[in-house]
């Protein structure tokens, strides 16, 4: 799949991002490389491969579930083009 200017413009609109004109060509190439890589992964024959939940046989220690004060929502919301009460406001894309 090739990422062209038409698709990049659609992605730009859906993501509410502004892509600088001097970065468009580079981004098209990078996205095309990512999509091509994923398409190659899709070609792998994995019918005889058992599903794995981890790549190692060791257990991962759990961290304590402690409540912490975080300003992540405020930080992310101030960079969003449109947000309200900690939520993103996005255009409707499904009819």
Curated annotation (Swiss-Prot):
<dbReference type="Pfam" id="PF02686">
    <property type="entry name" value="GatC"/>
</dbReference>
<keyword id="KW-0067">ATP-binding</keyword>
<keyword id="KW-0547">Nucleotide-binding</keyword>
<protein>
    <recommendedName>
        <fullName>Aspartyl/glutamyl-tRNA(Asn/Gln) amidotransferase subunit C</fullName>
        <ecNumber>6.3.5.-</ecNumber>
    </recommendedName>
</protein>
<dbReference type="GO" id="GO:0006412">
    <property type="term" value="P:translation"/>
</dbReference>
<keyword id="KW-0648">Protein biosynthesis</keyword>
<keyword id="KW-0436">Ligase</keyword>
<dbReference type="GO" id="GO:0006450">
    <property type="term" value="P:regulation of translational fidelity"/>
</dbReference>
<comment type="subunit">
    <text>Heterotrimer of A, B and C subunits.</text>
</comment>
<dbReference type="GO" id="GO:0005524">
    <property type="term" value="F:ATP binding"/>
</dbReference>
<dbReference type="GO" id="GO:0050566">
    <property type="term" value="F:asparaginyl-tRNA synthase (glutamine-hydrolyzing) activity"/>
</dbReference>
<dbReference type="InterPro" id="IPR036113">
    <property type="entry name" value="Asp/Glu-ADT_sf_sub_c"/>
</dbReference>
<dbReference type="GO" id="GO:0050567">
    <property type="term" value="F:glutaminyl-tRNA synthase (glutamine-hydrolyzing) activity"/>
</dbReference>
<comment type="function">
    <text>Allows the formation of correctly charged Asn-tRNA(Asn) or Gln-tRNA(Gln) through the transamidation of misacylated Asp-tRNA(Asn) or Glu-tRNA(Gln) in organisms which lack either or both of asparaginyl-tRNA or glutaminyl-tRNA synthetases. The reaction takes place in the presence of glutamine and ATP through an activated phospho-Asp-tRNA(Asn) or phospho-Glu-tRNA(Gln).</text>
</comment>
<dbReference type="GO" id="GO:0070681">
    <property type="term" value="P:glutaminyl-tRNAGln biosynthesis via transamidation"/>
</dbReference>
<dbReference type="InterPro" id="IPR003837">
    <property type="entry name" value="GatC"/>
</dbReference>
<comment type="similarity">
    <text>Belongs to the GatC family.</text>
</comment>
């Amino acid at each position: 799949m090739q990422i062209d200017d038409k698709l990049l413009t659609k992605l730009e609109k859906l993501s509410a991002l502004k892509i600088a004109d001097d970065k468009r060509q580079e981004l098209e190439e990078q996205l095309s490389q990512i999509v091509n890589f994923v398409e190659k992964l899709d070609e792998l024959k994995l019918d005889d491969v058992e599903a794995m939940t981890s790549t190692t046989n060791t257990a991962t220690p759990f961290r304590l579930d402690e409540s912490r004060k975080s300003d992540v929502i405020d930080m992310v919301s101030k960079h969003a083009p449109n947000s309200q009460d900690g939520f993103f406001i996005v255009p409707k894309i499904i009819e």
